[in-house]
Amino acid sequence: MQTIEIGNKAELQACKFLHTQELEILAHNFKALPYGEIDIIALDKDTLVFIEVKYRSKTKFAQAEEMLTYSKQQKLVNSASIYLQHNPQYQDYQCRFDLIAINESNINWIKNAFGVI
């Protein structure tokens, strides 16, 4: 399976999981050039959640949770800013950055995976 297909499958699995947790999916693979994309944007009651999905099929060398680098965090923050510029109806919402880490077949949802000053 190609890397993109694996990523899409993991993101679909994450979306299904988030639906079971009663989050409303607003966007999937939101492109925010030049920074990249946000895997999933969702509403958790009155909080706007920007979600990065990381998948590892083998955890011998690293867990999916370890793959969210500082550089990626900065790209997510910048991408979230662009999303808010394009969607002013969410400007007054609380925002949160979460990580969905999928290791083999286990899903770990880390709320507030990193903070923003």
Curated annotation (Swiss-Prot):
Disulfide bonds: none annotated. GO terms for molecular function: nucleic acid binding. InterPro entries: Restrct_endonuc-II-like, tRNA_endonuc-like_dom_sf, UPF0102_YraN-like. Pfam families: UPF0102. It comes from the Bacteria. Belongs to the UPF0102 family. This is UPF0102 protein FTN_0424.
